[in-house]
Amino acid sequence: IHRTEKQMIAHIIGDRVISDITRDGISWINERIKRPAYIWWNFPVSDYVRDHLLLGPVYGNDTTIAKEMSGFVTNPMEHAESSKIAIYSVASYAWNPAKYDTWQTWKDAIRTILPSAAEELECFAMHNSDLGPNGHGYRREESMDIQPAAERFLKAFKEGKNYDKADFETLQYTFERMKESADI
């Protein structure tokens, strides 16, 4: 690989088909190609989890490797509109990785993409971000806002104990919001 023409761009996807881009991974490839790699990040592409929308925050890529890359692009989902949150976020990351703010960028993307229903889109996206089990082992966090209540409720249910009313109400409220948000 190191003998390839210097004018050629070497698109690299990371150390697996889908993974976060790490310092170790980019150092490994740069040593072999003898120049900064051009990253083709396989996210939010979802052709291997077609029943999922990947609308959550973009996170996990090293924010200190800008000088080790010659470029950074995203591989979007087959759903153009649904890819916009991630495309916006990846563009922000690629523009200045050191100053990339996962949550602020995600919220900015949502407000930019659908300003008339940003709250609804945020609710829908918050609960549509994980890939689910897949052959690549790549996962994203999902429904973090209700995770503690959901875990406590599920534990009580499995143990045949009474659930906490506040947890139930939190989950019920969120599920109603999710239903309404999906219908905008």
Per-range role (PLM):
Residues 1-103:
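Catalytic-core regions of glycoside hydrolase
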